[in-house]
Amino acid sequence: MVSLLRCPSSKPYSSLICSLTLGAVVALSGVAYAEETKPAETVPVVTPPKVISQPATKNQVRFTKTGAFDSDTVVKIAKRLAAKPYVALKDPLPAGLAKLSYDEYRDIRFNPTASIWRDQGVPFQMQMFHRGFYFQDLIEIAIVEGQNATHLAYEPKYFTAGEVITQALPNDDIGYSGFRIHNQLNTNGVFDELMVFQGASYFRALGKGNAYGLSSRGLALKTADAEGEEFPIFRAFWVERPYNDSNLIVVHALLDSPSVAGAYTFSVRPGDNTLIDVEATLFPRVELSKVGLAPSTSMFLHSLNGRHDTDDFRPEVHDSDGLLMLNGRGEHLWRPLANPRQLQVSAFSDNSPQGFGLIQRERDYASYQDLEAHYERRPSLWIEPVGNWGQGSVVLTEIPTESEIHDNIVSYWKPRQPIPAGSEFHFAYRMSWGEEPAAKVGAVHVSRSASGRADIAKATPRRLFVVDYQIEGPMTDEMPVAKVEASGGVVTNVVIARNAAKNGYRLAFELEPEDKELIELRAELKFPTPRQVETWLYRWTL
């Protein structure tokens, strides 16, 4: 079973490890696919991009050369890069670093006294990550002040090595594998981690009081595709020195892969919900027909709603428990996540989506009982498109996993029309990371859902589903009417009742699958007085 291998968030460098293994999901024996119960589209065959392998010149700076810098600098570099065949850069590490074990890599730590902007009165600090272990790619970094960028060369003085490391750190400019940004997010005078860029185009952030959980990426290409996934990489970063009295830090990034080059700008504002405004320009080398914008990656092992065969003392284990969507029609949709027995892909068609994201709704420690992982503190991530994103689908990929160390959930926006080769494609969106991100939930929203066999006295194929709805504000005397639809099988015994414990209502119904192996479920509540109520969606599989 293959999925995204995670770095446990309790580790000091707080980044994804071995994030490039999702391309091997083709080893899975089957894929369940549905687009709101519609068949998958036929995708034309695309000629693969030309790839050239080129060794690096020692100490060569390719992108972040010291010199003038403005808002168009990275866009121009990306455009020039895309006009040429993709170059698979080779920046070999000294053998000792290339073969580091997990424990050895952890033993190379950034020296906090060497943090960028330390003791300069700046509300942010930056620390770099060493190359080694799984993080072999050379990442260039520059610091921008005013209209000038200065290349940040690797120096061993930035790092300390513990007793596990037996070799001296190199003196050559071998670059970095990424960096993290610190801020006084939780306590004045204490610089806690706020955001991390490391591994391919992965990054993740925290709101106040959060612990690292789900991640995002610059771009998703060919996710869960039979050819294998393509992972673009952020090759270089330009980090603007923040103003002393500002709550904003700006990061520019250069993205590259065999299929596309791109320029990104991340404007980061920490807070209870950390806001990140993303502006991106893509320059495809080939037609991008299997592209995902604003991708998020998370983990779902089990909960009350899925995979009851897991032998675990913890009631629930997940970084996110549902996909929330606010579509172009103003409909709020909640789709609980699942850990399926075979890889499955769902696509929710839309026109001009207003928002979507992977959400961690369950915030009660008692639901997890994990003193180390503290899943109740994992952030949610809400994506708000800027401008009209047109027609397309919110895509959800769920990959089977037997362990919480693997990220097995991916969501993104897939445009209906491919992005042509040789074009210039702009898009923008806002990300909100936090315990209660700026997700526009309905006045009546799902707080919990669970399923089990319908007959507690004997084995039966019939399934019982229970969905709890919570009301924002006081309860009224109104009783809603429930409507439950299924793409197959038979729905029976639909019951709606008040649930004072949740300040809302409980919907219960039974499903007789008959001979079906996959059934799409949809439940709605209708009130006498119109209210904005979340629609509950779920995919039942054998």
From Swiss-Prot:
Similarity remark: Belongs to the OpgD/OpgG family.
Subcellular localization: Periplasm
Source organism of this protein record: Shewanella baltica (strain OS195)
Pathway given in the UniProt record: Glycan metabolism; osmoregulated periplasmic glucan (OPG) biosynthesis
Function: Involved in the biosynthesis of osmoregulated periplasmic glucans (OPGs).
Pfam families hit by this protein: MdoG
One of the protein's GO biological processes: beta-glucan biosynthetic process
Signal peptide span: 1-34
Single GO cellular component term: outer membrane-bounded periplasmic space
Key words, A-Z: Periplasm, Signal
GO terms assigned for molecular function: carbohydrate binding; catalytic activity
Full protein name: Glucans biosynthesis protein G
Top-level taxon of the source organism: Bacteria
Keyword Transmembrane: no
Lineage, broadest ranks: Bacteria, Pseudomonadati, Pseudomonadota, Gammaproteobacteria, Alteromonadales
